[in-house]
Amino acid sequence: MKCDICPRECKLNNDVSAVGFCGFSLIEREKEIKLARAALHFYEEPCISGQNGSGAVFFSGCNLRCVFCQNHNIANCKVGKAVSIERLADIFLELQEKKAHNINLVTPSHYAYQIINAIKLARGKGLNIPIVYNTSAYDSVETLKALEGYVDVYLPDYKYADSKLAGELSRAENYPDKAIEAIREMIHQVGMPVVENGIIKSGVIIRHLVLPGNVRNSKAVIDRLVSEFGTDITLSIMNQYTPIEGLELPGELGRTVTEREYNKVLDYAFDKGLVNGFFQDGETCKESFIPAFDYEGV
């Protein structure tokens, strides 16, 4: 049996011991959803966080699991509390009651179909704020098609244009092409960002995290995005890379991105005609910007 929810296409059977790359078996995902946190979050792009905060729901497990992941404790399933689909729907409603501008699903890909059911339940009980799908973009196009009508805002990364680098850091040599296919489907569904009173209501914002020592990859990312989608896209270029103590990090990933590296990438984006987007200042590369995965709101 093959799990085709993402491009990994893990070969699994119905045994609970048959665990996919994301960290879970098919049976586990059918029975329960594991969460690490569900709370107002203020460190997204301004049009997502706004003044009230984004209702961020952090899912345990990940289908990409980059070696440098700042959320490695949840990506590797070290943290996670099991909840039902009914409880997840109630969490969405509780975040809405706290005046969240949106429901922000963080690393949701491996739970896509359970999330659809939770959104259905929550909307039946009055959920009416946008749903944000905050993903690595290592998503199956077929899974994304199932999400159409349930997701208002897609927030995909485009991490690598270099397949060799994608293999070294995420064990996903096909990431550059698969992520482009996924982003194309996202744009097809919801288009470019629609912002009202400073808050995004629908559309796609593409993110790229600049990695230390990898300016060339970042430039190639910009080239690929412009080639595929033109210069009207909204691109959020991030410098918040934070080396986590205790992780074995290859190459120059043991340090933060220099101001010179980051400015080179920004200048390149401007030179390529990209004018819609976001950039960060140097204060973002701190562990204090990484949430505490303490089961708040779960």
Where are these regions (language model features)?
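Conserved Radical SAM active-site core
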Residues: 24-149, 153, 162-164
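Conserved radical SAM core fold
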Residues: 75, 112, 137-140, 158-176, ...
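Alpha-helix N-cap and loop-to-helix initiation/capping positions
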Residues: 83, 110, 170-178, 213, ...
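Anionic-ligand binding region
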Residues: 167-197
